[in-house]
């Protein structure tokens, strides 16, 4: 009977280091990666996550915001449009009752506000503090002031 020789895999120091690093790699949850892609405006990755059903657009994340709120907060109209195309709710409220329209008005994004209104966003939706989107507009945001002309603004 032939003798069997046990062969042990030998690793060079470089291979051992690579293997150790691979064992220590960090894996972030899909929702964390998804929100990061939204903040960076990486539409290709945002679309991939949605199409692969790796995330839910309705989830309120630990930040207190849903994906659409994050996109509005980043000021990226194209990302907002992409999320809406895939079913994001333009009426969804964050944990303090803010809608995406509240954020667009507060942060001075007239194009996003106009887009949301064109889809039927509620101009009269009050947040938990009783503020309407128009109450949050800085008077220096002339385009937004004009957009809400005729509604109550202090």
UniProtKB/Swiss-Prot annotation:
Which molecular function GO terms apply here? phosphatase binding; protein phosphatase inhibitor activity
Q: Which Gene3D superfamilies match?
A: Ankyrin repeat-containing domain (1.25.40.20)
Classify the source by domain of life: Eukaryota
**Coiled-coil segments on the chain, per record:** none
ANK repeat windows: 63-92, 96-125
Spans traversing the lipid bilayer: none
Keyword list (alphabetical) reads: ANK repeat, Protein phosphatase inhibitor, Repeat
**SMART domains reported in the protein's UniProt record:** ANK
This molecule's function is given as: Inhibits phosphatase activity of protein phosphatase 1 (PP1) complexes.
Quaternary organization: Interacts with DYSF and PPP1CA.
Name the record gives this protein: Protein phosphatase 1 regulatory subunit 27
Query: What organism is the protein native to?
Result: Mus musculus (Mouse)
């Amino acid at each position: 009977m032939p003798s069997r020789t046990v062969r042990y895999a030998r690793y060079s120091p470089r291979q051992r280091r690579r293997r150790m690093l691979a064992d220590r790699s960090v894996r972030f949850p899909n929702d964390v990666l998804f929100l990061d892609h939204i903040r960076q405006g990486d539409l290709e990755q945002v679309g991939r996550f949605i199409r692969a059903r790796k995330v839910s657009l309705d989830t309120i994340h630990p930040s207190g915001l849903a994906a659409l709120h994050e996109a509005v907060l980043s000021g990226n109209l194209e990302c907002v449009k992409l999320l809406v195309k895939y079913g994001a709710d333009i009426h969804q409220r964050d944990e303090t009752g803010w809608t995406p329209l509240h954020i667009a008005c507060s942060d001075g994004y007239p194009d996003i506000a106009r887009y949301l209104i064109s889809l039927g966003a509620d101009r009269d939706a009050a947040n938990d503090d009783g503020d309407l989107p128009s109450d949050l507009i800085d008077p220096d945001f002339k385009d937004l002031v004009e957009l809400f002309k005729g509604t109550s603004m202090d």
